[in-house]
Amino acid sequence: MKKWTIDDSRELYNINGWGTSYFGVNDKGDMYVTPCKDNVQIDLRDVMDELQLRDVTPPVLLRFPDILDNRIEKTSSCFKKAAEEYNYKGENFIVYPIKVNQMQPVVEEIISHGRKFNLGLECGSKPELHAVIAVQCQSDSIIVCNGYKDQSYIELALLAQKMGKRIFIVVEKMNEIGLIAAAAKKLGVRPNIGIRIKLASSGSGKWQESGGDASKFGLRSSELLQALQTLDEKGLHDCVRLIHFHIGSQITKIRRIQTALREAANFYVQLHKLGYNIDFVDCGGGLGVDYDGTRSSSSESSVNYSIQEYVNDCVYTFVDASDKNEIPHPNLITESGR
C-alpha cells in the first residue's frame, strides 16, 4: 500500500488551487501563510503552539492585514495594466463597502494602506455613514451612499460634503429625489447625485437575485426617465454625475459580467446623448473569489475568471462604447468587498 505523502494532502485539499500565493503546506505537513511579498512563510502550527504557551486556547481568529494590503495593490495594478492596454483616459477608484467588515482594525488597515491608491468607502445606512465620516480618508477619496435613505441620512451626507468630503448620494427609490432636493435647498449644497439602474442582466451564483431585474433597489428604464424629469424640474440636472449598477455578489461567470457591462455602457452613452454629463460609473460589487480553487462557474464557491480579466472587461467595455460615440471615458468605481 502506498504511503500517504504531503503532496497527496496538497492534491486532496486542492491547496495550490484555492491558496493562490497566500496559503500552502510546508515540508513538515503544516499549513503556512505568506501574507507579504517577501515570501516569508508563517507556520500556523507554530503560531498556535505559541498562543497555547501564552494561555490562549482555541478557537482563535487570525487576521492577516498584509493580505488585505496585497489585494488592494493587486486590484490597482490590474486597472493600471488595463488602462495602458486599452488607452483608458479616466480614473479608477477602489471603494470598500464597510458592511463587509466594520471592525475598526480592519477598516483602519484598509484605509491606511489604501491612501496611496485613493481608496474610498461605501456605506448603506446612516450608522455606517457616521463611521465612514469618522475615518480619515484622503480629501479626494470617494464616499458612496447607498441603501435606504431618510431625511436625516441625506442631510448627514450633505453636511459631510460641506465639510469637504467627496460624497455621492445614489438614488435607488423615486421618493429619495424629493428628499435630496429639499435637504440640498435647506443646507445650500449642490449635491453629487448618482442613480442606481436596475439592469435586465443578472449575475450568477448564490446571490444572483440581489442584483439585476430581481433586485429590490434601483430604477428600471421607465423609472429612470421619470427620475431624470423630476431632477430637471427641481433644478438638479447638472448634479447627476454617476450611474451605479449591481448584478449580485460572488458572480461565478465572467459572461454574466460582460453582458451587464455592455448594458450599463449603453445607459452611459444614452444619458450623455440626453445632455447629462455623467463622469462616474460605479460597477458595484460582484468580483468573486475562487474559494475552492476549481476555477469553475459550476460551483457557487468558485469563479471562472481572474481579477485581471474582470478589470479588462470593465475598462474595455466603457472605452469601446465611449470612443464609438465620441464621449469622454468615465471614471470607474468598483465596490469589491472580497
Outline where the language-model segments fall.
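N-terminal basic/disordered segments at the start of proteins
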Residues: 1-40
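Phosphate/diphosphate-binding loops
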Residues: 10, 166-182, 221, 304-322, ...
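Low-complexity, highly charged intrinsically disordered N-terminal segments
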Residues: 25-102
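N-terminal leader/propeptide and maturation segments of large enzyme subunits in energy/redox metabolism
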Residues: 54-56, 287-288, 295-297
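Flexible, glycine/charged-enriched surface loops at secondary-structure junctions
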Residues: 58, 62, 84-89, 274-280, ...
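Active-site-proximal beta-alpha core segment in soluble small-molecule metabolic enzymes
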Residues: 87-278, 282, 289, 306
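Active-site loop ensemble at the mouth of alpha/beta enzyme cores that anchors a bound cofactor
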Residues: 208-211, 297-309, 315, 338
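N-terminal and secondary-structure boundary signal
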Residues: 254, 297, 321-328, 333-338
